[in-house]
Design a protein with these regions (language model features):
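PLP-dependent aminotransferase class I/II
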Residues: 16, 40-45, 214-215, 219, ...
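Buried hydrophobic positions in well-ordered alpha/beta secondary-structure cores of metabolic enzymes
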Residues: 23, 51, 75, 88, ...
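PLP-dependent aminotransferase-class I/II
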Residues: 94-149, 153-159
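Catalytic PLP-binding core of fold-type I/II PLP enzymes
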Residues: 155-189
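Active-site PLP attachment segment
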Residues: 190, 198-228, 239
Length: 242
C-alpha cells in the first residue's frame, strides 16, 4: 500500500510505529559522524547490504545523501569523472531536481529560466523516440532518464526504446543513469521500474519513498565506479559499501 501523498515519499504510511521506533533508537546513539566520512556507522553498512542484496550484481555500492537531487548531482559527477567527457544527455519532459546540475538536466523551462546560465553541454532528446537516440555518440559522458517520467504526467517508454538506449550506451562507453527517485521502491509492482525493461543501469538514484518521509537519498553503482570517488577529491568514504 503505497501512499502518494507528500510528493510520493510516504510509502509505508505516515508515522508507522516501527519507523518511529527505529528513529528514536538511532537518536539515542548518534545522528552524524564526521563531515567527510572518516568513520562509518554500522547501520549505514546494514542499509547498504540490505539494499544491494535486492539489486543486480553490478549495483553493489551505495552512497547515502540527504535527498534525491543530491543523488543525481553525484551521478552526473561520476559520469564525467569516469569517462573524462563533458556532454550530458537527458530527455524532454524530465525532472531530476532543483539543484544546479539536476535542474540543468531537467526539461521544464518555467523552473529553469530564473537560474540560467546552467550547466553547458546538456542536450535534451525527445522521450520515447527511438530514432532520436541515433544522435548519441562517444562524446557523451552520461545519459540520465526516468524509467517512468513523473513530472511530465506518468509517461512510460517502450521496451524497444529502453533497450536501444542501453545498447547505445554499451557501444559508446556511456554511463546510463536511471533516476528512480519517484518510480522506485515498489511503486510499479517491482522494486524498481527498470526491472520491467530487462536492462540494468550503470548508476541508480533513489530518494523520496526510500526514506519513508525522512530526508535521505542515495545512488548505487559498481564498486569499480564508486572507487573513483575515494580520493582527489573524495565524496566521503563512510557512505560507500564495499
Amino acid at each position: 500500500h503505497c501512499v502518494t501523498r507528500r510528493q510520493r515519499q510516504m510509502c509505508i504510511r505516515d508515522r508507522h510505529p516501527q519507523i518511529i521506533k527505529e528513529i528514536k533508537k538511532q537518536i539515542d546513539k548518534h545522528l552524524h559522524v564526521m563531515v567527510f566520512g572518516e568513520y562509518s556507522q554500522r547501520i549505514q553498512n546494514e542499509l547498504a547490504e540490505n539494499l544491494t542484496s535486492l539489486l543486480p550484481e553490478n549495483l553493489n555500492c551505495l552512497y547515502v545523501v540527504n535527498s534525491g537531487t543530491e543523488a543525481n548531482e553525484a551521478a552526473l559527477k561520476l559520469a564525467k569523472r569516469a569517462t573524462k567527457r563533458t556532454k550530458l544527455v537527458a530527455f524532454k519532459g524530465a525532472y531530476h531536481g532543483s539543484t544546479h546540475g539536476s535542474l540543468s538536466v531537467s526539461a521544464n523551462e518555467d523552473k529553469k529560466a530564473a537560474f540560467r546560465p546552467l550547466l553547458p553541454d546538456v542536450f535534451h532528446l525527445p522521450f520515447n523516440n527511438v530514432e532520436a537516440l541515433d544522435f548519441i555518440d562517444k562524446s557523451v559522458a552520461g545519459i540520465i532518464i526516468e524509467p517512468i517520467q513523473g513530472d511530465a504526467g506518468i509517461r512510460i517508454p517502450s521496451f524497444e526504446f529502453m533497450n536501444k538506449l542501453r545498447k547505445i550506451c554499451d557501444e559508446n562507453c556511456i554511463l546510463l543513469i536511471f533516476d528512480e527517485i519517484q518510480s522506485g521502491m515498489g511503486r510499479t509492482g517491482k522494486l524498481f521500474a527498470f526491472e520491467h525493461f530487462d536492462i540494468v543501469p550503470d548508476i541508480l538514484t533513489i530518494g523520496k519513498a526510500f526514506g519513508g518521509g525522512m530526508p535521505i537519498g542515495g545512488f548505487v553503482t559498481s564498486q569499480k565506479l564508486m572507487s573513483l570517488f575515494n580520493n582527489h577529491p573524495n565524496l566521503g568514504l563512510s557512505l560507500i559499501h564495499i
